[in-house]
Amino acid sequence: GWIAFLWWGLGYGLAVIGLLAASFHLGNPKNALKAFSQWRTSWLSREAWAAVLTLLLLAPVALSDWLGLGWPRVIGFAGAVACFGTVFTTSMIYAQIAAVPRWNNWTVPAMFLSFELTGGALLSGQTLPALIGCLALIAALYAHYTVGDVAFAKRGQTLGKATGLDIVGAASVFEQPHTSPNY
């Protein structure tokens, strides 16, 4: 009924907002449709295809839930797998950027998938899976920061190199992010 409509509407709304937001990463958002043509070499293109496929796979399930049709859930399982694929392709957009050593490693997909599983469990009110997901997420974040720090140091990165100011001397933070103590 209407509860299913609201939940599916929320999911579809967030997915569409995410796709629209992603189109602003492009140099010219009017050319967003061209992003679909590079699926053989571009993780961004694969993400676009995966997201559209996921939305299309889940549309019959959403319609069945909303109208109480009781259609078989097989397509829903395929849609769930497609959701994982979409989040994985999104993570690979970041993981393949060699210029950012903290991202250019295996921990990025692990972190994204942990966020996905934990968020899904929380939104669906699944207490034990949400707790397990939070623990997995903590482990994934710890691994990400540990591996990222090593990768950053291995490449000899510094604040000066990151800002391009290393040719002038040692770079430092001009002003701290806040001026009063934390609570």
Spans of model-derived segments:
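Alpha-helical transmembrane segments and their helix-start/interface "positive-inside/aromatic belt" motifs
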Residues: 2-9, 111, 130-131
